[in-house]
From Swiss-Prot:
UniProt keyword terms in alphabetical order: Cytoplasm, Magnesium, Metal-binding, Nucleotidyltransferase, RNA-binding, Transferase
Listed GO CC annotations: cytosol
Required cofactor names: Mg(2+)
Catalysed conversion reaction: RNA(n+1) + phosphate = RNA(n) + a ribonucleoside 5'-diphosphate
Positions bound to Mg(2+): D488, D494
Physiological role: Involved in mRNA degradation. Catalyzes the phosphorolysis of single-stranded polyribonucleotides processively in the 3'- to 5'-direction.
Residues in KH domain copies: 555-614
Gene Ontology MF terms: 3'-5'-RNA exonuclease activity; magnesium ion binding; polyribonucleotide nucleotidyltransferase activity; RNA binding
Stated name of the protein: Polyribonucleotide nucleotidyltransferase
Gene (UniProt): pnp
Subcellular location, record wording: Cytoplasm
Amino acid sequence: MSIFNKVTKSFQWGQHKVTMETGEVARQASGAVVVDMDGTVVLATVVAKTDAKPGQDFFPLTVDYLEKTYAAGRIPGSFFKREGRPSEFETLTSRLIDRPIRPLFPEGFFNEVQVVIHVLSLNPEVEGDIPALIASSAALSISGIPFNGPIGAARVAYVDGQYVLNPGKTQLKDSKMDLVVAGTEAAVLMVESEAQQLSEEIMLGAVVFGHEQANIAINAIHELVRDAGKPVWDWQAPAKDEPLIAKVNELAGAKLQAAYQIRSKQARTQACRVAYADVMAALKADGVAFDGVTVEGMLFDIEAKIVRSQILAGEPRIDGRDTRTVRAIEIRNSVLPRTHGSALFTRGETQALVVTTLGTERDAQRIDALSGDYEDRFMLHYNMPPFATGETGRVGSPKRREIGHGRLAKRALIAVLPTKEEFPYTMRVVSEITESNGSSSMASVCGGCLSLMDAGVPMKAHVAGIAMGLIKEENRFAVLTDILGDEDHLGDMDFKVAGTTFGITALQMDIKIQGITKEIMQVALAQAKEARMHILGKMQEAMGEAKAEVSDFAPRLYVMKINPEKIRDVIGKGGAVIRALTEETGTQINIEEDGTITIASNDSAKADEAKRRIAEITAEVEIGKVYEGAITKILDFGALVNLLPGKDGLLHISQIAHERVEKVTDYLSEGQIVKVKVLETDEKGRVKLSMKALLDRPAQNQDQDRG
């Protein structure tokens, strides 16, 4: 009799077989599920505290996705030989799992919940994110914790005009899209994607296809819950204090209504703060017993009701716009004198200062990924300091949100970057958010595109991004173009679309409610396209095309090709030749296995000198050609003559002169410069030379020949 009560469910999902197990591993967690998807194995665990902390006013959910190097049969490369801080991929995957599960916890549930996912085994063809999403959903569903799931998730590719479910990494290379969709049986909750300028119809089709296929996983989770689910918690949302709600409404309603007639963000925020303080003071004066956190929640609900009802009634939005208008845009290029490229992009009260730096191949980021190491020649980093929203706060290493926003902006721009052959530079873009009132990641896309073009990067097209919002009450809904920060917090959807005039390059969607239909998404995509075209027009006015030349402060790259067999000659013994070349010419030289050499220098004369010397080193000795070189060594039977760097030939004693030569030193000395002709080379590469072939014969010899 086993001590384990193991339950297993398997299903075929596209080209993969998926197995879910519970009851054997991590039994002390509230819920634990192991998912095996064709050799990629993940363990998801969920633990929830039975009580919320007193005074808790938010839902403390943490999601940690952790990759173990043993999963790929590797030992960590760090000094300590153990896993360290999360990689960017781990952070992004943690966010990917958090986003669709967070809205499914009931309102008022403030107990701490921790979801931890370990990647235990990795098939390089099957990334860990989709199995991790499925395992997390299953672990939450069997745990008994209040959770309105399960959710399913799927990756969708677009290959040869067809949607492909959960493609392998190799297949993704041929795809024009990499899209992840997650949701319940009834509704899509999250979309994350990048694409190669695809139409709205193709993108929406992928979302619908992925959602349909995700239901296969949801059905399997339902079966697992039926056989292994724990009793559902007897949890009730805290009862609402209706008399206090009515009192707060009476005290604050008119004041907050007036505050939301103020168009300036800072003035409006200040008016709301005053209203909050007045309500607290009035409640104290009336002797009402209340919890400050609870009252703040009530005031937030009043704000949401005011804003949402105004929009659904067709009234102007918070800042006076209608639902389709983009805020005023100002663009300035080349704002920083000594950077390689820069742009200041301002849209309303959101502003991004974006700077591009060009580097050599050595500057590319080397990524030690679990599925294999690779180099990334395009980096985009997003920073949002607290002053951007007029606040004080911590300044330091990037938070999860900043990493996520940077990745979204990067996804948007990748599709239009030149290839390495077209533009061999490494590119780093940094977006400094200097003001924020909604959609700073999309401002980073616009500013990033302009900054790259300012740096002389030959982009295939301009890319613009726009953030859309949604307000929905029963059958009424309104899609909002270019949402403000407050509209993001108070709305039901955050929907970001980036692309060119030809199509979409990135799409991110986060939905807080059920009931978002395909038709609503269609309206949102069409409205987003209209806004994107408007912004692209402004960007094209400001900068029609990329600068023809890179900045004077950027390194110049010169590319040449050599025979791969000559690489060792350029490098030299122990790197002596390449080291001398770089030091003496003041250049950076990079050599690839196929014989491509990239020379980086700010001085074209130095680069030309490096090219000349490499050409000499790699040149082949030609039969019949005349060379001028120094004698490097005198031998009894001749002399060695240097023809090319690192290449000597033998001048035999019989080839020095027409007359008989008794002693080589009677004619030649070390260091002497002589002209020689190449007679032949043998199979070992040895070169035979002649001096006498270039000399006229003495007259008597000619007469004797005639006789």
